A protein has these predicted regions:
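Feature captures the catalytic ectodomains and active-site-proximal regions of enzymes
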Residues: 1-257
Length: 257
């Protein structure tokens, strides 16, 4: 269908979902599968999927300075970013403000996702936890992504999603215990809802998309511990305050930066 002298426009704005196919057209060293070279092919994209001179970008990426990872690096803090394949870009490229290369003092670890998460709803939680616990004394800051809740919720299967969340619950519990033993502080949060709402109330159909439900922000540390009744906790969970933009400054304050 695509011939020489054609123009090819990619209009999806999600880099992590588009860079693979775009690389097949503009990557000089692409060798994942055989392809026919097309002369004078004009390839354009809505946003910057990859850094390649052959890709014409309609809206270049604005430079974002002093993101959390960059500020930690400037303050000589060692940081560890870990996720499985499904969410690796979220703890690297996206977390680092659309920068592909790690900052000084940053280590990235990728745990390869299993082929069928429906048959393995625990996904890579065990490997991620094991790696974090083994590295806990070597770094000042960790950003850890557990993909189960998001990935499994897209299938709309409540039973499978519950198993995935249970795996996360166990994993977070192990990390929490290790962090508190060392006198550290831990934050548990998310950037969107999904697993908590898998059915549309109006129709009863499966709800498999992200939603804008309020997400929790749990601040865990001995200095923040206080007794609260079940009613207090339930009341707090119904309130919505704060923004995702508040998290990075909160972390920097906790770290004395």
């Amino acid at each position: 269908v695509i011939r020489e002298n054609d123009a090819l426009i990619f209009f999806n704005f999600r880099e992590d979902s588009m860079r693979q196919i775009v690389e097949a057209f503009v990557g000089k060293e692409f060798n994942i599968f055989g392809k026919k070279e097309l002369n004078n092919l004009y390839v354009a994209s809505l946003t910057q999927y990859i850094e390649n001179a052959s890709l014409h970008v309609a809206f270049p990426i604005p430079e974002i300075k002093d993101g959390l990872a960059e500020v930690l690096s400037k303050n000589s803090k060692k940081q560890y970013h870990i996720a499985e394949t499904e969410k690796y870009a979220h703890v690297t490229y996206f977390f680092n403000c659309l920068k592909n290369m790690p900052f000084d003092g940053e280590t990235d670890f990728l745990s390869k996702s299993l082929k069928n998460p429906l048959e393995n709803p625990e996904m890579r939680t065990d490997e991620i936890v094991g790696k974090v616990l083994s590295e806990l004394d070597r770094y000042d800051f960790f950003v850890i992504n557990f993909a189960n809740g998001d990935t499994l919720s897209h299938f709309g299967n409540l039973e499978i999603a519950v198993k995935g969340i249970q795996a996360i619950d166990k994993a977070v519990g192990k990390i929490k215990s290790a962090v508190l033993e060392r006198g550290g502080t831990m934050i548990v949060t998310s950037d969107h809802g999904n697993a908590e709402s898998l059915t549309y109330r109006s129709s009863g159909e499966s709800e498999t998309r992200h939603n804008d439900n309020p997400v929790p922000f749990y601040l865990i540390g001995e200095e923040f511990e206080r007794h609260r009744s079940d009613d207090d906790i339930a009341s707090t969970m119904k309130q919505s305050s704060g923004l995702l933009a508040d998290i990075a400054p909160t972390i920097l304050e906790l770290m004395g930066i």
